Every structure is written in structure tokens, then in C-alpha cells.
Amino acid sequence: MVVAKKSLGQHFLTDESFLDRIVDALPPLNPLKLVEIGVGLGDLTLKLLDRYPLKTYEIDSSLCEKMRSKLKVQKKPFKLELVEKDALFLKEEEPYFLISNLPYYIATRLVLNALKDPKCRGLLVMTQKEVALKFCAKDSQNALSVLAHAIGNATLLFDVPPSAFSPPPKVFSSVFEVIKESLKEKALASLAQVPFFEEALQKGFETLEDFLKACFSSPRKTLSNNLKKSVSYKEKLDKVLDFLALENQPTSVRASEIKDYLKLLNYLLKG
């Protein structure tokens, strides 16, 4: 019997109906490779192997061994490449699509890593509902939603109750997807003055991420007050005020009320 490790944030999805819904929600993948973070008890992995070849990253050696044992008994039409490694260091040489029931404690960081990775063309993941709502929020409600929608289209798909897991978590989970869009990627890459597109895209994403940290540092305060405290952007405050005037927005605007962060950041970087 496998005991969930609290240190790794393990809650295993065991409800067959929700496992099927996740697999059915995958978009057409060809020619993308499918990459999974976390093998868990193998329930989702085995269902995926009925339809796709799969590469899975798993840090827990005992779960890796259990998965290898299962595959000796349950023959699948597609092959599993099981990598015993921390997914924080996930690095693929070819374009891929990410799928995962992410550990709550590290979910945000793993999603941001995938969004930042030019090789990742999209993702379908389950996180704590609160995190999913932040990534999928419309307009500029928070920094995570701005980042997700700056590079693609983020959509909340469905909720998953605690009873679907073993052991059950204390909160609801949600499944959401982010599908990257080439036009948005080009706009992000234009923020960086480097010759190679993938490098420019990653640097552009990091530039926007850094800017948003300053803008949303105190969400209830005005954008101007937040940027005054930023070492990187306080000297550009006059240009921010110029931009707000051009956009017919008041100087008392909050970060969540900015209509177009890429437009604002481009304006700041030009001067």
C-alpha cells in the first residue's frame, strides 16, 4: 500500500469519472509529445497510455517502482518513458504538451515554468481551485491571469471535489488549460532585444513577470504607489503617468484596472 507523503503534497486522484474527464479534455496533440508531471498511483498515467505515448517526471522513487510493476502486468498500446527527477528541472528538446495533477504547494511555480518554456505549447493541469481561478481570471485581476493570457488562452474546465482523492484534501480542486498562441508569443518576444525567438520569448516573459511583481506588490494600493517602492521601476514613474494620461485612465488606478500590460511595458521600455 502506498502512503501519501505530506512533504510532497500528494493527494492521489482515484475517481474514475474525473480521470476520464481529464483525458477526454486533452486537445489534439499530433505532432506534440505528451509530458506528465507526477505519476501518482498511476491511474491517470495508465489511462493516457491507452491513447498516447507518454513521458512522465516523478520525484518519488517508490511511486516509480510501483508504476514499473504495474506496467509489467498491464500491457498498454503506447510506451511510457518514466524519468525519476524533480519536475522543477523539466527540460525538453522538442515541443510538448503538459498534463498533470499538480501538488498544491508547488503548483503555481510549475505552471509558470511551463508558460515560460518555449517548448511547452500548452497545458492541462489540476490545481487547488483558488490557484486555477487566478490563472483563468479575465482582464487584469491579478498577475497570474495577466501572464497566462499574455501568452495564450486560459480556460477553467471543471471542479473536482475532495472526495475524488485519496487522501482527500481540505479544499476543492479545478482543472484548467492554457493553450499558447503564436501572435501573443511574438508580442512577448518583442520585449527582449535578443536575436533568437525562443530566447526572446523566455526573456520577454520574465520581463513581464518581473514588472507584474512590482505592479501587484500591494494589490489594494494604487499602481503608482506600488511602483514607487520598486527599485527597477520607480525611476519610470513619470512615464507610467504619461501612459495613463494617453489611455484616459486616472493616476489613482490600481494594478487590476490596467487594460493592457504589454502596451504599458512596451511604452516604458522604449524610453
Curated annotation (Swiss-Prot):
Gene Ontology molecular function terms on file: 16S rRNA (adenine(1518)-N(6)/adenine(1519)-N(6))-dimethyltransferase activity; RNA binding
Main subcellular localisation: cytoplasm
Compartments where located: Cytoplasm
Keywords, sorted A to Z: Cytoplasm, Methyltransferase, RNA-binding, rRNA processing, S-adenosyl-L-methionine, Transferase
InterPro entries: KsgA/Erm, rRNA_Ade_diMease-like_C, rRNA_Ade_Mease_Trfase_CS, rRNA_Ade_methylase_Trfase_N, rRNA_adenine_dimethylase, SAM-dependent_MTases_sf
EC number: 2.1.1.182
Family, as annotated: Belongs to the class I-like SAM-binding methyltransferase superfamily. rRNA adenine N(6)-methyltransferase family. RsmA subfamily.
Function: Specifically dimethylates two adjacent adenosines (A1518 and A1519) in the loop of a conserved hairpin near the 3'-end of 16S rRNA in the 30S particle. May play a critical role in biogenesis of 30S subunits.
Official protein name in the record: Ribosomal RNA small subunit methyltransferase A
Species this protein is from: Helicobacter pylori (strain HPAG1)
